[in-house]
């Protein structure tokens, strides 16, 4: 198998193998070799990197095609190389969702912040005054009784995702309650939360805790097929330095008991200059502001991702709930 295009394809295939294998390993165990450190510094969800993914997929398909038609290769060898290439293609889609992100970005048109909540009717259950009191009580019980780790401790992917103080106490912490459409065991003791999170539109949920004087640098999300809903569980509403988020150059200031729907695929960052912690309930919602056929495809992609053994194994390794002693 000779030729410039094929040689490039082979190199892309080899490099993508490193990406597929090392990306989850980095997430679980931390970078142990230079290439792992190199790879985790990339945000594979930016528009520029998505364009590179399109080029990569073109080269990968070229490789598969050339392998199949090459008369010099044994059939078994052809099948083996094709199987490897197709699986690399599969896991890159499942882990990075790059091509689908590009497509959704071309057909969606919504503001960064304060998206109409009609696209998530479930917000009413969270924002109902009486129900919110119960939800808030259960969330704070989890915060007080579980050892909720910094995102930096959960995964090396987040090691640059928060500005920490050096006292070991002030950071950005996160506790999953629902992952890949599946409720976590922790909810067995919290019936109000469990009932609210059984909504099939909710794909991921967690408790996000931003300690006093902590900020989250600029970043974007990973999947355009979601909208992000947050309801504020705790903040000091009387503090003039209340925490806020800037998303797509639009500012939103959290208020206890108030929910907001936004698109985290816009560049955004969070600032907490107050002396109080900010706690929000964080939900990834399957996007509904799409044509019906696209909604069905998007839901199918989410369903495939939720059943993927590799991604579920990684999440289990990253987010283990430990109760305080």
Locations of regions flagged by a protein language model:
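Non-heme Fe(II)/2-oxoglutarate
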Residues: 3, 7-10, 14, 73-78, ...
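Short, conserved beta-strand element in jelly-roll/cupin
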Residues: 209-211, 222-239
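A short beta-strand-loop-beta hairpin characteristic of the jelly-roll/cupin
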Residues: 233-256
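A short glycine-rich, His/Asp/Glu-containing loop-to-beta-strand
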Residues: 194-212, 225
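Short beta-strand His + acidic residue motifs that chelate non-heme Fe in jelly-roll/DSBH
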Residues: 216-219, 245, 262, 268-274
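Conserved metal-binding segment of the jelly-roll/cupin
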Residues: 253-267
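Intrinsically disordered, low-complexity, charge-biased terminal/linker regions in eukaryotic proteins
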Residues: 1-97
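A short hydrophobic beta-strand segment most commonly corresponding to one strand
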Residues: 228-235, 261, 275-292
């Amino acid at each position: 198998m000779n030729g410039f295009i094929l040689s490039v394809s082979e190199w892309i295939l080899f490099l993508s193998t490193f990406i597929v294998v090392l990306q989850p390993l980095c997430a679980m165990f931390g970078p142990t070799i230079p290439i792992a450190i190199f790879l985790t510094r990339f945000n594979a969800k930016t528009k520029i990197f998505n364009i590179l993914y399109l080029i990569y997929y073109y080269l990968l398909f070229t490789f598969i095609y050339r392998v199949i038609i090459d008369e010099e290769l044994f059939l078994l060898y052809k099948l083996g190389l094709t199987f490897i290439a197709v699986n690399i293609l599969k896991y890159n889609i499942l882990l990075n969702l790059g091509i689908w992100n590009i497509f959704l970005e071309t057909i969606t048109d919504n503001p960064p912040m304060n998206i109409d909540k009609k696209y998530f009717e479930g917000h009413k259950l969270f924002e109902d005054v009486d129900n919110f009191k119960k939800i808030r009580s259960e969330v704070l019980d989890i915060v007080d009784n579980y050892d909720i780790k910094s995102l930096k401790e959960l995964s090396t992917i987040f090691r640059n995702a928060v500005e920490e103080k050096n006292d070991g106490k002030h950071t950005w912490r996160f506790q999953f309650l629902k992952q890949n459409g599946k409720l976590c065991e922790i909810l067995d003791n919290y019936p109000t939360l469990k009932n609210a999170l059984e909504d099939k539109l909710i794909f991921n949920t967690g408790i996000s805790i931003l300690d006093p004087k902590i900020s989250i640098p600029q970043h974007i999300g990973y999947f355009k097929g979601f909208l992000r809903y947050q309801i504020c569980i705790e903040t000091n509403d009387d503090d003039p330095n209340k925490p806020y988020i800037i998303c797509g150059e639009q500012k939103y200031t959290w208020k206890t008991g108030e929910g907001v729907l936004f698109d985290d695929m816009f560049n955004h960052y969070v600032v907490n200059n107050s002396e109080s912690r900010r706690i929000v309930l964080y939900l990834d919602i399957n996007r509904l502001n799409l044509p019906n056929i696209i909604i069905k495809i998007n839901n199918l992609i989410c369903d495939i991702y939720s059943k993927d053994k590799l991604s579920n194994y990684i999440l289990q390794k990253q987010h283990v709930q430990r109760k305080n002693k």
